[in-house]
Amino acid sequence: MKTEPDRTPLPDGLGILARLDGGGPLPELTAALNALCEEAGEQRERTVVALRCTPPPPGARAWPGDVSIHEVNRWERAVRRLERLDNVTVAAAQGVCGGPVLDLLLAADFRIGTPDLKLVLPVNQGQFWPGMTLYRLVRHIGPARARRLVLWASDIPLPDAVELGIVDQISDDVTGAVRDAALLRGGPPDGEVGIRRRLLEEAASAEYQDAFGAHLAACDRELRRLRDSGPGPSAGTAAGGAGAAG
């Protein structure tokens, strides 16, 4: 059993690119994802973590397959670990994908799909798999649209995935798109990515006054970071990134 993803450095030291088999057994995928997160955590410099998910064999659909609840628990924890990395994460998918690929796309910061991408939903005997995909779908697209997918859909065609925000960019050059995304979306240094993710997540449910304190603390941290870095490249890069985002 292969327990590590096929990992290679991104060009120009931008980060790590890992290829994951979208049709692999759940324990193997879990081990591969944990190994990738471990490597990302050991990097001393700012690192983008990019995942390139390959489609399963034609006709494969059942997810997660014949597994134990303990294996499901380990998989969900690995996806959450990816989601909470202090790195910008990019996920790319191609072909007809399902199961783990939808989990990884929803957990990533930026998502790339090829023109032939179709996301097959994790439906077994007519019932949507009740894993944390449900939770992420609701958080990502809202309960009404998530309900339509869960109760009546069997797949998400690429145009729908783009409209729902599950795919951010379409490209038939996955390698180039991943590199460009890593170059443009390297994000803030150190633990700043995680802070911004938490602020975004909490904004969906927190009251204004509750959120205000967390945002003010983040602003104070950012002012100190910019002051420490001075008017050099770091501050300029941060300002340029903010301008591009706007």
Short names for language-model regions:
Residues M1-T54:
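Conserved CoA-thioester-binding segment of acyl-CoA-metabolizing enzymes
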Residues D109-F110, R148, W152-S154, I166-Q169:
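Well-ordered beta-strand positions
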Residues I112-T114, V167-G213:
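C-terminal long alpha-helix characteristic of the crotonase
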